[in-house]
Structures are given as structure tokens and as C-alpha cells.
Amino acid sequence: MNLKVILTPINLKGEEEPNCVERITIMPCILIDTEICLNVRCRSPFAKFKVLIIVDGFDSAYIQATFCSISDSVTIVNKSNEKHVTFDGFVRPDDEGTTMPYVIGPLYSVDAAVADRKVKDVVDSIQNQQTMLKVFINEANVYNKWNMLKGLIYNNNNESVLVK
């Protein structure tokens, strides 16, 4: 199974810069409880990246991938005969048929309690904050009418239980 992460930079005007896209492909050796951390260095404290995640190269007929951030989550199941799942953002609250692009950036706010600290300490605390996106990938059990009927008629060895 492959986990592809595509980061598209967004400039200060809000425009995507497709010529500076970063592509990362991860092929986890052990799929059980694998934790992967990507650190992205930005060229500016105002830089942002649009995130696209593709899960492909799996053997199962159906998989479900759940993407969780601090405030949102979404689960995606691949269609039949399709061997990839694509995450491009979370569901838009006012229109569930579209997604909002998932954008990350290094510009974070700092609590007022740290106002008496040195500038270097404040900058370090801003740079050390992380955007967490958790991805859970499992085999999905998808049942349609034919599979349910087949389960009633045939046993596990594909022998008919009606013709004994």
C-alpha cells in the first residue's frame, strides 16, 4: 500500500503555485499501528500548503480511509473496481456535496501569557507547533444485494447449500 502526500504551495495572493509542488510517497512496511510524521519547512511564516493525500496500491477490494484533524473528520471508501482513495479536504458545512481544501501553514497565534518572553522564545514556540492529521486505513466490509444473496445460498467453499 502506498500513501502519497502532495503539497501545493499557496502564495500570499491566495494562488496555487503548481510548479513548486512537493510529492512524498510513503510505503509503510508494517501496516499495523504505523505512525508517520512529516516536518515541512516553509520559506515564509505566511506560506500555506494545500494538502492532497492518495492511498493506492492495496490488495483489498474495498478500503476505508478515515482522515481526522483537531476539528473535523471524514471517512472515504473506494468505489468498486477503483484502486485508490483521494483526500482533498473536509466536507463543507453548508454544502455536503463539496469539500473545502485542506490547507496547512506555519502561522500560529501565541497566548497572551507569553507576552513577557523573549522574541526568540515566542518564535520557537510558534515554529514547534504542529498541524496534526491522522489517517486510519482499514479493509472495508461492503455488502450489496448480490453478496447478501450469495451468502444465503453458498457456504464459504462456494458450494450451494440448497443442493445437498
Curated annotation (Swiss-Prot):
**Localization terms from the record:** Host cytoplasm
User: Gene Ontology cellular component?
Assistant: host cell cytoplasm
Source domain of life: Viruses
Q: Does the keyword Translocase apply?
A: no
Q: Which InterPro entries match?
A: AcMNPV_Da18
Q: Which UniProt keywords apply?
A: Early protein, Host cytoplasm
Q: Does the keyword Hydrolase apply?
A: no
Q: Which Pfam families match?
A: AcMNPV_Orf17
The principal localisation class reads host cell
| Disulphide-bridged cysteine pairs | none
Question: What's this protein's function?
Answer: This protein is required for viral late gene expression.
Output this protein's name.
Early 18.5 kDa protein
Q: Native species of this protein?
A: Autographa californica nuclear polyhedrosis virus (AcMNPV)
User: Which gene is the coding source of this polypeptide chain?
Assistant: DA18
